């Protein structure tokens, strides 16, 4: 089999490339996906409110685990990644957050990445998006990604939590992806107008599937990339459970879109990576690149949970006897509790004036439950997810063998820098101040977690070590740039070889301020134009917020009360 392009991974980036490259009728594309189809009749991946289910089990989830994390009580921590058409957009929380404008301006300040500024990237965010309330300077109206905005009559806890954030002295913003990310406000989500998950399989592949120049093979696990000298010429993969070896050849390029965990694995198995690691595993060296698998970053988060004095939370939706009605309304009408991911409000703040742009993110949820659906509190409640955005901690990914079925060694090295501890202590204390504001007086009951007795630095640190979780945002493990640890250039081309690019979240040089899916799609849209030889979209001229000397917060309406004294 021979194609112009072979794409490894039908995820958030790979599906974008497959759709855009096959717009050229004379180009042939093979799309390889290790998982199966995105079964449209499986409510677990299609119903937004069922987002916890795909993380349970291994049908749609690679279910990686980290090595024991030394600063987290040596816990082996979850590292879920999507498996199937759509990749992690098939199992994520559907929060449509692009990051802060300053993230991209920081990227553009790095050598070789000058065209990755916010105003360079904004046109590609707009190209990818169709927002339900229409386009403007920041949002698109004709893209494959369906973006739904929260409606005014949604759960009152969303409005109360945003109001409480403002009363605590932080800004309000009407659009976390618009002029000003900083502040509290409504949170957009990747959900269709009919209440279905808007994965990249639904948005991009559905457009491309009818084209004769696209071939999609599922249950195809990539073993390694093939080379002739320094040129990538094809892919060796295993088909199905039997593991029958297959080979496909690429006339032009191999495009690696495996994500931040799989892409460095595949490069290392293919002979591209740290020379000492490859030598130890008897993998023939094609190109020594010490940065492959290094610079690994993620977002860590915690939940602060509270009981709710009024029966307005989503707790009844967790009871089995209420779920058939919810499912029927969603299935036939695309409405109701099932049609939302229930992350409809949140925010970004600076915990201290020293930060140039937000370093803390909030997701508000009108129920008290773990992200993966476990440990639901058996009463009406709500919670704030809170975590730091740009931790200085760095991890790494290393293959353990040549076997493509063996999971790699993953170490994020969470909380390995003193700044991490300062930020998380600040985050807990600030959250308590927010929850103490008058807007939540009608709803706020007792603090369930961490609990009123957790107050000192040592007590907070113990809670963080035991309870902080991944936000499922691994990135930066094949970073772009031109320094000695960079893996790809600003167009995704792997240094030192020809005919090979990496296009996914792994090429971010630094993690962004927020959820990764929207930015991963943007990266693929931008590089797709490069691959096709298209003129880049014209830079935006939209104005955007820069904090400058603006204080991180103003005086709160109510200064923090002792946790035991909440009304």
Curated annotation (Swiss-Prot):
Its EC number is 1.1.99.1, 1.2.1.8. This is Oxygen-dependent choline dehydrogenase. NCBIfam families: betA, PRK02106.1. The active site is at residue 473. The gene is betA. Belongs to the GMC oxidoreductase family. Gene3D superfamilies: FAD/NAD(P)-binding domain, Glucose Oxidase, domain 3. PROSITE patterns: GMC_OXRED_1, GMC_OXRED_2. GO terms for molecular function: betaine-aldehyde dehydrogenase (NAD+) activity; choline dehydrogenase activity; flavin adenine dinucleotide binding. Involved in the biosynthesis of the osmoprotectant glycine betaine. Catalyzes the oxidation of choline to betaine aldehyde and betaine aldehyde to glycine betaine at the same rate. It catalyses: choline + A = betaine aldehyde + AH2; betaine aldehyde + NAD(+) + H2O = glycine betaine + NADH + 2 H(+). It holds the Pfam family GMC_oxred_N. Keywords: FAD, Flavoprotein, NAD, Oxidoreductase. It comes from the Bacteria. FAD binds at residues 4-33. GO terms for cellular component: membrane. PANTHER family: CHOLINE DEHYDROGENASE, MITOCHONDRIAL (PTHR11552:SF147), GLUCOSE-METHANOL-CHOLINE GMC OXIDOREDUCTASE (PTHR11552). InterPro entries: BetA, FAD/NAD-bd_sf, GMC_OxRdtase, GMC_OxRdtase_N, GMC_OxRtase_C. Pathway: Amine and polyamine biosynthesis; betaine biosynthesis via choline pathway; betaine aldehyde from choline (cytochrome c reductase route): step 1/1. One of its GO terms (biological process) is glycine betaine biosynthetic process from choline. It comes from Yersinia pseudotuberculosis serotype I (strain IP32953). Its cofactor is FAD.
């Amino acid at each position: 089999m021979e194609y112009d392009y072979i794409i490894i991974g039908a995820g958030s980036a790979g599906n974008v490339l497959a759709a855009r490259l096959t717009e050229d009728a004379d180009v042939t594309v093979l799309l390889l996906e290790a998982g199966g189809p995105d079964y449209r009749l499986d409510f677990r991946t299609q119903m937004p409110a069922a987002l916890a289910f795909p993380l349970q089990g291994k049908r749609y989830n690679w279910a990686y685990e980290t090595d024991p994390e030394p600063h987290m009580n040596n816990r082996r921590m979850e590292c879920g990644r999507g498996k199937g058409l759509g990749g992690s957009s098939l199992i994520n929380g559907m929060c449509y957050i692009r990051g802060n404008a300053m993230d991209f301006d920081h990227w553009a300040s790095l050598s070789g990445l000058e065209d990755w500024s916010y105003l360079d990237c904004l046109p590609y965010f707009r190209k990818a998006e169709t927002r339900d309330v229409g386009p403007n300077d920041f949002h698109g109206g004709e893209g494959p990604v369906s973006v739904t905005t929260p409606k005014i009559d949604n759960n009152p806890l969303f409005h109360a939590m945003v109001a409480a954030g403002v009363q605590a002295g932080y800004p309000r913003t009407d659009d976390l992806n618009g002029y000003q990310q900083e502040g509290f406000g409504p949170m957009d989500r990747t959900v269709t107008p009919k209440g279905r998950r808007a994965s990249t399989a639904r948005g991009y592949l559905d457009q491309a599937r009818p084209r004769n120049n696209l071939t999609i093979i599922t249950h195809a696990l990539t073993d390694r990339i093939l080379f002739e000298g320094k040129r990538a010429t094809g892919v060796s993969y295993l088909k199905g459970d039997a593991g029958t070896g297959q080979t496909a050849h690429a006339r032009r390029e191999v495009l690696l879109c495996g994500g931040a965990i799989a892409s460095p694995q595949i490069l290392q198995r293919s002979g591209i990576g740290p020379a000492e690691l490859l030598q130890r595993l008897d993998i023939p060296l094609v190109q020594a690149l010490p940065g492959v698998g290094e610079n690994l970053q993620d977002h860590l988060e915690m939940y602060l949970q509270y009981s709710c004095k009024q029966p307005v939370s989503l707790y009844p939706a967790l009871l089995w006897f209420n779920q058939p009605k919810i499912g029927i309304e969603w299935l036939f009408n695309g409405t109701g509790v099932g049609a939302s991911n229930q992350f409809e409000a949140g925010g970004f703040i600076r915990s201290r004036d020293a930060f140039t742009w937000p370093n803390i993110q909030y997701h508000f949820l009108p129920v008290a439950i773990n992200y993966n659906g476990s440990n639901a509190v058996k009463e009406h409640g709500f919670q704030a997810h809170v975590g730091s955005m740009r931790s200085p901690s760095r991890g790494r990914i290393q293959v353990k063998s040549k076997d493509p079925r063996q999971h790699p060694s993953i170490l994020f090295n969470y909380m390995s820098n003193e700044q991490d501890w300062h930020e998380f202590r600040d985050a807990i204390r600030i959250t308590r101040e927010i929850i103490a504001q008058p807007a939540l007086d009608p709803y706020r009951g007792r603090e369930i977690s961490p609990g009123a007795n957790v107050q000192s630095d040592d007590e907070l640190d113990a809670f963080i070590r035991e309870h902080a979780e991944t936000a499922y945002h691994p990135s930066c493990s094949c970073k772009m740039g031109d320094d000695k640890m960079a893996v790809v250039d600003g167009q995704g081309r792997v240094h030192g070889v020809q005919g090979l690019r990496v296009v996914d979240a792994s090429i971010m040089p630094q993690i962004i301020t927020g959820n990764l899916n929207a930015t991963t799609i943007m990266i693929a849209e931008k590089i797709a134009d490069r691959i096709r030889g298209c003129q880049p979209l014209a830079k935006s001229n939209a104005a955007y917020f820069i904090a400058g000397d603006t204080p991180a917060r103003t005086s709160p309406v109510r200064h923090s009360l002792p946790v035991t004294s909440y009304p």
